[in-house]
């Protein structure tokens, strides 16, 4: 691998593995609102949001940090009231109780409109128009009297293709930015085109000082889990797995149960809207959690070295990034399938596996979890993460025994990269109708 290739991959990881507070879809909407408000230059009197189906799906049932509330309206209100676009996916980190109360009043005043954006194919699309009627005073030459006139102001911001990727900005009709939406391949560039072998080679040979930044993912995501253990968030799966005597009699107090408890606990806190940052991957905090904590706990429980941990985390996160390159940011496929595949690679590496065993682990994961639907971000995501992480451990164990699902079985190909493309084809193309059905069910449940 050339130095330029290595540099390109490091830059890719640093773009995709970033801190986030709260579920990234409503937070991305808040970010877009914050930018539109900044362009407007004052508090908007009305905000219109036109969103893709996948953004709507992932924002309907998830907690918004620091609010005790769920869903888009409060995220939009806070984006306008206290959001700062310079903070990126931590846009709401300065939320206060007073701001939440002001946001509730904004919602009660029906100042926020949320609609499905029709006629688009992009799955990650956020269009915000913020408007206000400012009062301007003008003095007549005939007298000292002044007259007040209403001067309508508006600003539009559009994010598409990535959770922080602004493609359009305007103020009162004047276009400030109009950037064409690039494909995933164009965004990544040819230099960062990946294969599983390239991912493995990079993770196992890159100079340690160039990739040790990945340890920040361990620090943030483990802290999120430990915060969760102290409270009662979501379905409390992580806390239950850690403390329940019933659980102890079934799973015991071992590496497996500890991995499950830490990983699901971090998800419990995040989906409940706890004001705690996590390290995300490819725009998803849950993916970042799932790619990080199983490896972190396995390494701690088995006394692995700092270098082994760094390389395993790098392998996991870069595998997730690689799979997402062809799957896309949002899809009908649950993101834990992808993230747990990354963690299975990292755990296999920590078990002493080489490239062949890591390939086997990926094949086993694809054979098992392909087709798990995403029905939005919500507290029960922790249950899906538990399924994904359990499978990642089983897949790694099988791989170390040289057991691999073969190409005569289902969607598995002899070439692991082709198996990955089979997975992402199903998730990004074949499950589109599933996505429509899921959103239709979610929006017509009558609850």
Spans of features found by a protein language model:
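N-terminal signal-anchor module of multipass membrane proteins
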Residues: 5-40, 44
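Conserved phosphate/anionic-ligand binding catalytic regions in large, soluble enzymes, centered on
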Residues: 19-35, 276-293, 335-338
